[in-house]
């Protein structure tokens, strides 16, 4: 089984900054649910998708059948991501791909054998799929 883990807060932060805004992770953002919906489109058999967000669980959050979402509460989402990568790699021998622009998080996850895709490459790949109407981006394929 393959697991794709997204640093959701990092991805959203970069989108907000590209629009000249600063996100507030203490409050719900429409971009959170949009990211989950987008990822559920690319789910393939044998691939698990997890998205991690900083901050408290959202009271209006709806569970998605294809994408598992985690909120860090008072902890850092980065630490939860690293713990998950370590567990999946060491205990289950799973292939893990991390999507983040955070260099320190990338390095921490690589120590457990995770593949890394930068947020910039993630968006570029997604836009190419949308533009050329391909079925799924390379990072989602087994």
Describe the residue ranges of each PLM region.
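Nuclease catalytic cores that cleave nucleic-acid phosphodiester bonds
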Residues: 2-4, 10-142
